[in-house]
Amino acid sequence: MRHRHGLRKLNRTSSHRLAMLRNMSNSLLQHELIKTTVPKAKELRKVVEPLITLAKKDTVANRRLAFARLRDRDMVTKLFNELGPRFATRPGGYTRILKFGFRQGDNAPMALVELLDRPEVAEAVEVDGAAE
């Protein structure tokens, strides 16, 4: 019976799953928005949210714990210098999962995973006067 097992295997070995979630965590922390399948997104949320909670208190021990999970010094620095202070007053729920349709090849349900309170990106505004 599969009662009370806390994770999805995602058709991968444990080492492959760990490496994939580590890479996806680094990508999410770097870009603050990634596109993936819904089951991977739900598993990624279980990895990233505790890391952000860890980053709210900047200690050497917490940095080492985060580095043990991410294995990327630049992402640990961003996590503690930018993301930790950004979410200091939020008591949890740092990510949002938005359903994003289905993948073309295999019809897998896709999702966008984003960090909340992202800074707005200024989009280029087209000038209508140039077309005249």
UniProtKB/Swiss-Prot annotation:
Gene Ontology CC entries for this record: cytosolic large ribosomal subunit
InterPro entries linked to this entry: Ribosomal_bL17, Ribosomal_bL17_CS, Ribosomal_bL17_sf
Domain of life: Bacteria
GO terms for biological process, alphabetical: translation
UniProt keyword list: Ribonucleoprotein, Ribosomal protein
SUPFAM superfamilies: Prokaryotic ribosomal protein L17
MF annotations from Gene Ontology: structural constituent of ribosome
Family: Belongs to the bacterial ribosomal protein bL17 family.
UniProt cross-references to PANTHER family, sorted A to Z: LARGE RIBOSOMAL SUBUNIT PROTEIN BL17M, RIBOSOMAL PROTEIN L17
Quaternary structure annotation from Swiss-Prot or TrEMBL: Part of the 50S ribosomal subunit. Contacts protein L32.
HAMAP family: Ribosomal_bL17
Protein name (database record): Large ribosomal subunit protein bL17
Species of provenance: Ralstonia pickettii (strain 12J)
High-level lineage: Bacteria, Pseudomonadati, Pseudomonadota, Betaproteobacteria, Burkholderiales
